[in-house]
Amino acid sequence: MIAKGGRGFVGLGVLATIAALPFEKYAAVGLGAFTVFLAIMFRDPKRTIGKGIVAPADGTIREVDPSKGLVSTYLALRNVHVTRAPIPGVVEKAEIIKGRHAPAFARTSTKNQRFEILVRTEIGQVRAVEMVGAIARRIVPYIEEGQSLAKGEKLSLIRFGSRVDLFLPVGSVRIMVKKGQKVRAGLTQIAEVPDGGLE
């Protein structure tokens, strides 16, 4: 399945490949390969939702800071780029903020274009910041303010590689992932509530 916001790119790739085929086979092969790349990039696989607080994005954990409740995930080009709600709640803020396009792993990336999400949950306010990178140019939101979210529900599509910073309520959760760990959105448990909630 292709994610909403990526279908047009894949469709154009298919049409361009077909159009080029009668005239330039090498170009058609190149366009076909690029279309396959786009289909992989914008894939939206079904997920079994995991226990506890789950990862908001596919990728690699780049930073963990329990003192801030921070879990930061870097998305490479090969990763699924559909983000998901790590915890159920109500959306209090869902805003695209314009900014730069520095590499997503750079310190200056905090000033990049981003999608800021605040969710009111039973354990307190959870904040997610989805940032575009040097290649990622746009975030396609799937949610709006006032909306109730189920755990694992789709939040957005980030077009190409990027980063997601998740801020959990300090003292309310125990972070369970480490820097360098691979995670999958909606599936990998990244934190737990000490009293055993959010199963």
Tell me what each language-model feature is.
Residues 1-199:
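Contiguous, well-folded functional domains in the mature portion of proteins
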